[in-house]
Amino acid sequence: MAFQVNTNINALNAHAMGLVTQRELKESLERLSSGLRINKAADDASGMTIADSLRSQAKSLGQAIANTNDGMGIIQIADKAMDEQIKILDTIKVKATQAAQDGQNTQSRKALQADIVRLIQSLDNIGNTTSYNGQTLLSGAFSNKEFQVGAYSNETIKASIGSATSDKIGQVKITTGKNITASGEVALTFKQVDGVHDVSLESVKISTSAGTGLGVLAEVINKNSNATGVRATANVITTSDSAIKSGSLSSLTVNGIEIGNILGIKKNDSDGRLVAALNAVTAQTGVEAYTDSVGRLNLRSIDGRGINIKANSTNVDGQASALTTLNGGQDITRGSTNFGRLSLVRQDARDILVVSGANVSASAGYAAIGFAKGTTANTTVNLRDVLGEFNQAVRSASGANYNKTLASENLTLGSGVTTLRGAMVVMDIAESAQKMLDKVRSDLGSVQNQMVSTVNNITITQVNVKAAESQIRDVDFAQESANFSKNNILAQSGSYAMSQANTVQQNILRLLT
């Protein structure tokens, strides 16, 4: 055993171990005071990288939750505004329905129209002023907007809000065929009703017999309107080309029912003799007669069957014939036949493609019901059009020109609900507008539900990401307290060991005494 004075190996070892203990004690105190296991990169280089990534992800998820909540707020604002617009449209339709009966006079219809104008202005005011953070929501400008709903780029939800102003909603496609003058069997097919599929309807006979005619065809079309999106109205009205003259009608027949001779008919049928004779057999003919404001005879089919009226040219008791031509030039002595006009309405404004069967091209049309190419009256109207006057094109397309006699007058349909037919057009427009807004709201509801699901998911994800970061970054106090106690004891024992190592050197002095 060697004894040295210049180098105290035991003291040096004790000092070195004391330094290690002091460093570990310092790190332990740092962790206990900060609550973090990783306070600097040297503590855990790879763990710090992962923890920082998780922290960034958690913070981004927090902002994504805020973004999604903002998006839901926007949708809720738009949804409530459109809910109010739909209530306005309900009122417009009710007022149009109120105007669509001839118990209303011109003044009452004008009052209803004034109410409707105000309501449309209110609807437009909502559409133009509903906004979020300076962005209008219902003008059509809020389209294809994106909301970041994830921690990483391009994790988005898109939302669009369609226009809800009167010039963009309520589009209605109105189509009316020409007057039908030929009988026959009709079997219709509506082409590409949903853009792809065709819908074929049962066949209907067009004639003057009961249980036939455009009235039955309209019922068949309306029965299938859920599949086709098309509704139909049959207008079968025969009108004399001129006012009723003083005279007589010989051997008068309507739809095969003989009425006989009618004598002493006065001008404009002022005493109602002709109308009374015709209406006496309404149950057999299915035809109702009346005179209009200018003294013309009008025959209306009450069930939509065709109308055939005929009288001999022979004068009775020297009296001239009270009627000569009807329906734009049809001679009563040869027989005037009219099967009416079929009006079709589609509330999404797409073209109505109607043909005779699945093997006929859509462009061919179907002449038997008046829809041959070039012979139909087509137009599209929207809610904004209700504010002004419906023009002659709308009048014809809506079926208000029941026959050539009325069409030749080139009249307009008036403003909004100021006429019976105009009121019915407004009813269709209001219903179409309601459906359009309901579709927009339905789409927004789906987007909002998507956002709710996303928020629920990323909220849980954020919690789990923070938990994962905590596992890496945060200190385990129980474990670290044990480490601190160990290092504290080692520091104290190290100091004692160094003191003893220095004392050992004094034993050399005993060798010198």
Swiss-Prot record:
Role according to the record: Flagellin is the subunit protein which polymerizes to form the filaments of bacterial flagella. Important for motility and virulence.
SUPFAM superfamilies: Phase 1 flagellin
Family named by the database record: Belongs to the bacterial flagellin family.
Source superkingdom: Bacteria
Keyword line: Bacterial flagellum, Secreted, Virulence
Localization (cell): Secreted; Bacterial flagellum
InterPro entries for this protein: Flagellin (IPR001492), Flagellin_C (IPR046358), Flagellin_C_sub2 (IPR042187), Flagellin_hook_IN_motif (IPR010810), Flagellin_N (IPR001029)
Stored NCBIfam families: PRK12584.1 (NF009234), PRK13588.1 (NF010115)
Protein encoded by which gene: flaA
Quaternary structure note: Heteromer of FlaA and FlaB. FlaB is located proximal to the hook while the remainder of the filament is composed of the predominant FlaA.
Protein name, per record: Flagellin A
